[in-house]
Amino acid sequence: IEHLQNCGLVSAVAILQMLDRNPGKSFADLRRALPTTYGSPTMSPYCADEEKYGVIDRIIAEVQADADSGQTVIGQKIVDVNTVNGVRFTLEDGSWGLIRASSNTPNLVVVVESPTAKKNTVGIFRDIERRLKAYNEVGEFDQKI
């Protein structure tokens, strides 16, 4: 359901389809069956519109180089790097971090999630925060975890 979080109508259709595929189960039953995940709020450090896409390009190169060289984040190798609309890196246990340019504000967007532990979300955020501090173009976060 992760990719549906930004569109209410698409989410509603997906929920109805899940209910249709699972006759005899309520929405509450289906929700209880979902695995627990530990996610962050959307965190947005300032980055000027004219700078943010260049910063993201450099972050993409940095994360890809780390993945290629076997570097770790929270003690886990980066097993996937998705560069569609920013960079999303996935770790061995399925935990991930996302850094992208906001499409409508002078900010970057940072989100992290782990299927295994809250401490992993905090650790991934600390790694992203460390990376972003290296860029003078990136300001303070609006919130942190």
Where do the PLM segments sit?
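Phosphate-binding and adjacent anionic-ligand microenvironments
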Residues: 1-103, 107-111, 118-145
